[in-house]
């Protein structure tokens, strides 16, 4: 058996991998194991399992997500503990990039093998590896893994549970189970079932409250004698406040039950705000467990005291660590209990109030999960902060991190391509130079003042680090070009940039005359539209800077009109439109209106005036064509003619007839173009139409025995092949590049547009058509590993092959949801969602597909079909 397979089985024996992990499937390949280990989480978990306490769980980033920084930090933590605690020499270990980039996976396997032979591992009774029957010459199987790593993501199941929390639900069931509860039987009436549900809510709440009292009486009281106030607060968090709330909560439930339970929904609605304190408890739970474990390991007096206390609670059946998990599990059960009660209350007069109570507890669960998630995010941001030199601002002010990693960066001004490490946040991209394990700050680029555009070059360059895109300043200042290692990496970075920009500049930010900005709310705030919480601890939603209301991203378009807008801002029923103006010059936002949103336009655009003081240099208006509103210089417009039509200007490029020009080929497919131009001399070119594509025109040119294709972008009445140089017409563009080399835009295309194809004599007969495989393709495609087919796979196929996920259910979206992250799935009310995974359901997230996209979505935002 190959050594990597033995390694996988050993990790299963160490309870690091589950018994049915894909590494033991017959179809498994070595990359399956490499991919499982690349983020360092499982290796750190391995050390914890072999020697509890050898590694501080606080040092592990259990959800590194899209962060190279956090993955490498995990790997370095593993290597340090192997050296310091297990005594492995540096020569017996590996470089972090040997694993992260899978440069030398053989060294990783060798290091894990040495751990398996260590006396600590041997004491567990687990057979080490390799065994004598190891297959020889494993080196061949490790080749090409680095290329596979370039093409495949790390695992992104970011909403599942942290490994050390998996048993929490079982602990809850053991502690809170109610022995007197009878299972529902066949033949029971709906009233009987409803009574069972009511009884379960009451009795489990009573059992839970007794558990809280046990913790207070038998642990908190005695341990105050041996712990400092700071340690007490770290271990028990705000448990005293929880106990006070649940004393009142249980009394209210009991009173409702004495009246038949018809007012139980009202009780939950009344206590929703008071239960928000669970956000603090749950977000500090991990730190509390870590502090408790450290105290138990470092202080013998404390350990003995805890053992004495444990014997007083249910005969020592549960440890303090177990009991501290129960509050987090309990608060996330309320919506499940109410959902079951609602399903047996079809004809009850309080049904509507029960629905409202269910939604309230679902909202509470989502709020608590997001607070916990934000605490983890802030921890990651703090680690970034400590690693970047010369950083004078708090990174958390820039929103949530999206992605980080190594790119090459070139300033559009000086054209020097440099190796840089980027941290992308919602608001900025931090550009750094890597210095060992730290980073030197080079640039902070504010995304609000930039737009991203693709490098329009069609052809793939076979060299790495040649896949580029632009970040262009909206006011013509310095821009940047970024280069990625692979096309897939470029796609991921561009998607994350798009998501970040949509967070700080959402499409509906000015809907109904509001002026919404992403904002951190100091107090718990409800969305003005849906009335649900704005969730988390920072940048929870959007604040209107005019009227002060808060909203979710997905609710911006349905917020009632802004109350602080002037009458001219609102389309009053029956009121006529404001005076129309026509733009007499282009305005792209420079100069910018002080503290106001910008309205950009082109010469000839018609603008409806919303607010305009004759003595003011700035007016507010709305473009008639797009309905977009904002501020602009009053000197850039003049009154429109009475009929409302703008003066005659130049016709758009789509209305110009280019057929007389010797370079215009009309409608022509890419393959046909290749066949036509390959027999011509270098520098021969044509312009062709692409009617089925978003960009209508493309330049095709023969250069160094290859045909290159460049799309021509038409946007905002300008036409260009690169953002750095724009033209008013296609003819102007062609005339420019007849005299200037394309190298200005594309480094490897050092040629002008020399010979229009119609004016050149054919020099040779056409060669036979190229095969499809030989044609350059701009579309993303997988690089198929040798020996693997990407045809439909059997259930045992490697997880990184192309496959159709198994649908385990369907649901209908009850609310709109706007993704804040590329891993999330946006929903519109009424969308039918295919459910692929409920892993992470206790964290509030399911995985599914709708509208052609796959991602994670809040489980409480959908109603599962076929489930009563």
From Swiss-Prot:
Q: Which positions fall inside the PH domain? A: 400-502
Tell me a GO biological process for this protein: cell migration
Keywords for the protein's UniProt record, in alphabetical order: Angiogenesis, Guanine-nucleotide releasing factor, Metal-binding, Phosphoprotein, Repeat, SH2 domain, SH3 domain, Zinc, Zinc-finger
Tell me the PROSITE patterns matching this sequence: CH, DH_1, DH_2, PH_DOMAIN, SH2, SH3, ZF_DAG_PE_1, ZF_DAG_PE_2
- Which positions fall inside the Calponin-homology (CH) domain? 1-120
Write out the GO cellular component annotations.
Answer: cytoplasm; cytosol; plasma membrane
* InterPro entries linked: CAMSAP-like_CH_dom (IPR022613), CH_dom (IPR001715), CH_dom_sf (IPR036872), DBL_dom_sf (IPR035899), DH_dom (IPR000219), GDS_CDC24_CS (IPR001331), PE/DAG-bd (IPR002219), PH-like_dom_sf (IPR011993)
Residue stretches making up the SH3 domain: 576-642, 806-867
Q: Which Pfam families match?
A: C1_1 (PF00130), CAMSAP_CH (PF11971), PH (PF00169), RhoGEF (PF00621), SH2 (PF00017), SH3_2 (PF07653)
> Lineage of the native species?
Eukaryota, Metazoa, Chordata, Craniata, Vertebrata
| DH domain span | 193-371
This protein is called Guanine nucleotide exchange factor VAV2
């Amino acid at each position: 058996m190959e050594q990597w397979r033995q390694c996988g089985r050993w990790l299963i024996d160490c309870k690091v991998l589950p018994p049915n992990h894909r590494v033991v499937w017959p179809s498994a390949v070595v990359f399956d194991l490499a991919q499982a280990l690349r983020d360092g989480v499982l290796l750190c978990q391995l050390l914890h399992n072999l020697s509890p306490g050898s590694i501080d769980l606080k040092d592990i980033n259990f959800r590194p997500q899209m962060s190279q920084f956090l993955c490498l930090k995990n790997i370095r933590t593993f290597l340090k503990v192997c050296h310091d605690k297990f005594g492995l020499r540096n020569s017996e270990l590996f470089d972090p990039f040997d694993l992260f980039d899978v440069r030398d996976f053989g060294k990783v396997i060798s290091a894990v093998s040495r751990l398996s032979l260590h006396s600590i591992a041997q004491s567990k009774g687990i057979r080490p590896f390799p065994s004598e029957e190891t297959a020889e010459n494993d080196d061949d199987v490790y080749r090409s893994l680095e290329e596979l790593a370039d093409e495949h993501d790390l695992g992104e199941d970011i909403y599942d549970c942290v490994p050390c929390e998996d048993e929490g639900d079982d602990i809850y069931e053991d502690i809170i189970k109610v022995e007197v509860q009878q299972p529902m039987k066949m033949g029971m009436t709906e009233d009987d079932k409803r009574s069972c549900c009511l009884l379960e809510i009451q009795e489990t709440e009573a059992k839970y409250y007794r558990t809280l009292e046990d913790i207070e009486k038998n642990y908190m009281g005695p341990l105050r004698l041996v712990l400092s106030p700071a340690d007490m607060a770290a271990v028990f968090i705000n448990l005293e406040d929880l106990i006070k709330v649940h004393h009142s909560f249980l009394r209210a439930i009991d009173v409702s039950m004495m009246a038949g339970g018809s007012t139980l929904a009202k009780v939950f609605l009344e206590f929703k705000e008071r239960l928000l304190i669970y956000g603090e408890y749950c977000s500090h739970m991990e730190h509390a467990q870590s502090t408790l474990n450290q105290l138990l390991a470092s202080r013998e007096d404390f350990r003995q005291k805890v053992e004495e206390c444990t014997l007083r609670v249910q005969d020592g059946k549960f440890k303090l660590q177990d009991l501290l998990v129960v509050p987090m599990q309990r608060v996330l059960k309320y919506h499940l209990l109410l959902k079951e009660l609602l399903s047996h209350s079809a004809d009850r007069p309080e049904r509507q109030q029960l629905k409202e109570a269910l939604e309230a507890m679902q909202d509470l669960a989502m709020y608590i999960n997001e607070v916990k998630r934000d605490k983890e995010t802030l921890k990651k941001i703090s680690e970034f902060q400590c690693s970047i030199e010369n950083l004078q601002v708090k990174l958390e002010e820039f929103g949530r991190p999206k992605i980080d990693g190594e790119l090459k960066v070139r300033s559009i001004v000086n054209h020097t391509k440099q190796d840089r490490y980027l941290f992308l946040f919602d608001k900025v991209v931090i550009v750094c130079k890597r210095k060992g394990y730290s980073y030197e700050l080079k640039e902070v680029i504010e995304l609000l003042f930039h737009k991203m555009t693709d490098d329009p070059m069609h052809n793939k360059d076979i060299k790495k680090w040649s896949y580029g895109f632009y970040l262009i300043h909206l006011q013509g200042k310095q821009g940047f070009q970024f280069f990625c290692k692979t096309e897939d990496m470029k796609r991921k970075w561009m998607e994350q940039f798009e998501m970040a920009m949509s967070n700080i500049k959402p499409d509906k930010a000015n809907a109904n005359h509001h002026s919404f900005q992403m904002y951190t709310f100091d107090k718990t705030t409800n969305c003005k539209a849906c009335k649900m919480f704005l969730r988390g601890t920072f940048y929870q939603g959007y604040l209107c800077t005019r009227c002060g209301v808060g909203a979710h991203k997905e609710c911006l378009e349905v917020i009632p009109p802004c109350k602080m807008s002037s009458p001219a801002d609102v389309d009053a029923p029956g009121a006529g439109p404001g005076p129309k103006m026509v733009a007499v010059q282009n305005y792209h936002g420079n100069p910018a209106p002080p503290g106001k949103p910008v309205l950009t336009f082109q010469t000839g655009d018609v603008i409806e005036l919303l607010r305009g003081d004759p003595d003011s240099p700035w007016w507010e208006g709305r473009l008639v064509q797009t309905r977009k509103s904002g501020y602009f210089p009053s000197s850039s417009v003049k009154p429109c003619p009475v009929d409302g039509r703008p003066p005659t200007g130049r016709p758009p490029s789509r209305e110009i007839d280019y057929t007389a020009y010797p370079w215009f080929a009309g409608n022509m497919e890419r393959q046909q173009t290749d066949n036509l131009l390959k027999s011509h001399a270098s520098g021969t070119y044509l312009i062709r139409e692409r009617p089925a594509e978003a960009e209508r025109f493309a330049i095709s040119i023969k250069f160094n025995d290859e045909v290159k294709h460049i799309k021509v972008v038409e946007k905002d009445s300008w036409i260009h092949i690169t953002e750095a140089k724009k033209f008013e017409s296609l003819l102007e563009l062609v005339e420019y590049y007849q005299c200037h080399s394309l190298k200005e835009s594309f480094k490897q295309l050092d040629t002008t547009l020399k010979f229009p194809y119609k004016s050149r004599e054919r020099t040779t007969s056409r060669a036979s058509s190229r095969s499809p495989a030989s044609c350059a393709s701009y579309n993303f495609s997988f690089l198929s590993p040798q020996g693997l087919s990407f045809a439909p796979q059997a259930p045992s196929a490697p997880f990184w092959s192309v496959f159709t996920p198994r649908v385990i259910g369907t649901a209908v979206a009850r609310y709109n949801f706007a993704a804040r992250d590329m891993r999330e799935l946006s929903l519109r009310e009424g969308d039918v969602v295919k459910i692929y995974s409920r892993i992470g359901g206790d964290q509030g997230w399911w995985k599914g597909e709708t509208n052609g996209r796959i991602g994670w979505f809040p489980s409480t935002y959908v109603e599962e079909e076929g489930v009563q």
